[in-house]
């Protein structure tokens, strides 16, 4: 029943289910090696053209078995804390490890200094508290800034520049901190901003203007400037020309090395979630297919963002003959993936394939309601598959006890 689908999430598989898919267990994440490599090559070519340094933001994708595909094209990894920093150091050895956290724990700092090369602090207070030790350990020290420039519509949960944001230091906060402690500027090697979410380079250009206006005098004294993440660099149609102009502007105006730390761009359209239909029920005019996967457990951003993930061969509601609501088997009434249309109602046992499932899935999933974690497989460039890991009852049990 699945027809050829030319949309970007499915282009790598020719827009159709291959025989290898049918043999895989469900639910199952299938990570596409060729698509990951293609994304990494785009990022690597950007680095070569502009001199910028690109990091993998592990918060979006940390399937380290596939790091060897990414590492040749990247400068290293970005971490949000101790565990991600350690993972980056272990799985991309000899590469840079950068870390940013809204607040660091004192009892973790000594170990963190073993793994991180760059440490970015969120506030002047944290910079004053931990910056001297980081400098003494030979680390490059940065401060996350808040340029107070929102470029997002409808995603306040992902807007670090929203009023009352806890993320980043405003210029007023910095000036007040320096007035109280004039030694703070000497601790800094670079500045970091992260204000985008799944955006094009025009939003970056607007943000960079704000950064220049509020922090330009500081940047001339810095070694590096980190543009953060949220850049959809590998998305078809992304404005690479504007991105490169922003990078070159930072080089020319302030003499800094530019870092980018995309997460989604590294693994965009490079994964699938395979699932089968368990039951089909009718409630009034609504046809509901209950799947062996769960939005709440296996693709939590569907509910958190929220958004409706692409589904191979399916149309928008009303586009095809039969509109069906796809939902999970948990007790959560809102465990709904979305409404899709098909030529015919999916039958029990039918295989469905969701696209763009490499990002914010395996790193965020959970076992609510006792839902098993999906197996993780990789798809080789020749179309064959290999098992990366599987999960069972012990994984569920041991998260809450010994």
Question: What are the language-model segments listed below?
Answer:
Residues 19-24, 190-194, 228:
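A short small-residue
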Residues 205-210, 239-246, 275, 341:
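Charged helix-capping and loop-helix junction motifs
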Residues 251:
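Active-site neighborhood of glycoside hydrolase catalytic domains
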Residues 149-151, 197, 233, 266, ...:
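Feature marks short, surface-exposed loop/turn motifs that line or immediately flank catalytic pockets
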Residues 194-196, 225-234, 262-265:
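Glycine-rich beta-strand-to-loop/alpha-helix junction loops that act as flexible
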Residues 246, 257-402:
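Charged (often Lys/Glu-rich) extended helix/loop segments that serve as interaction or gating elements
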Residues 7-94, 99-104, 108, 294, ...:
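N-terminal capping/small domains of soluble enzymes
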Residues 52-224, 246:
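Active-site-proximal beta-alpha core segment in soluble small-molecule metabolic enzymes
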């Amino acid at each position: 029943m699945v027809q050829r689908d030319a949309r970007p999430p499915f282009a790598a598989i020719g827009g159709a289910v291959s025989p290898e898919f049918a043999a895989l267990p469900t639910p199952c994440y299938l990570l596409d090696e060729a698509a990951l490599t293609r994304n990494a090559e785009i990022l690597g070519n950007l680095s070569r053209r502009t001199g910028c340094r690109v990091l993998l933001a592990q918060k979006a994708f940390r399937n380290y078995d596939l790091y060897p595909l990414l590492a040749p094209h990247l400068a290293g990894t970005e971490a949000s804390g101790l565990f991600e920093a350690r993972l980056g150091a272990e799985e991309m050895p000899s590469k840079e490890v950068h870390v940013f956290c809204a607040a660091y724990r004192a009892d973790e700092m000594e170990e963190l200094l073993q793994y991180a090369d760059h440490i970015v602090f969120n506030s002047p207070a944290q910079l004053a508290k931990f910056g001297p030790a980081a400098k003494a350990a030979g680390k490059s020290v940065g401060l996350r800034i808040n340029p107070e420039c929102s470029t997002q519509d409808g995603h306040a949960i992902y807007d670090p520049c929203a009023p009352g944001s806890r993320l980043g230091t405003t210029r007023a906060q910095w000036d007040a901190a320096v007035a109280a402690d004039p030694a703070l500027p000497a601790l800094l090697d670079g500045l970091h901003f992260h204000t985008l979410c799944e955006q094009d380079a025009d939003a970056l250009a607007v943000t960079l203007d704000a950064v220049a206006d509020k922090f330009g005098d500081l940047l001339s004294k810095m070694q590096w400037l980190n543009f953060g993440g949220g850049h959809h660099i590998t998305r078809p149609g992304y404005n690479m020309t504007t991105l490169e102009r922003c990078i070159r502007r930072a080089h020319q105006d302030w003499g800094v090395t530019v870092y980018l730390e995309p997460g989604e761009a590294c693994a965009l359209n490079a994964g699938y979630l395979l699932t089968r239909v368990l039951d089909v029920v009718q409630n009034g005019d609504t046809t509901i297919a209950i799947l062996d996967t769960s939005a709440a457990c296996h693709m939590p951003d569907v509910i958190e963002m929220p958004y409706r993930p692409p589904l191979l061969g399916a149309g928008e509601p009303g586009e095809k003959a039969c509109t069906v609501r796809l939902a999970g088997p948990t007790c959560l009434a809102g465990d709904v993936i979305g409404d899709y249309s098909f030529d015919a109602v999916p039958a029990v046992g039918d295989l469905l394939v969701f696209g763009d499932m490499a990002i914010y899935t395996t790193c965020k999933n959970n076992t609510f309601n006792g839902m098993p974690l999906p197996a993780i497989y990789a798809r080789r460039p020749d179309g064959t598959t290999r098992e990366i890991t599987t999960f069972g009852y012990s994984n569920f049990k041991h998260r809450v006890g010994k």
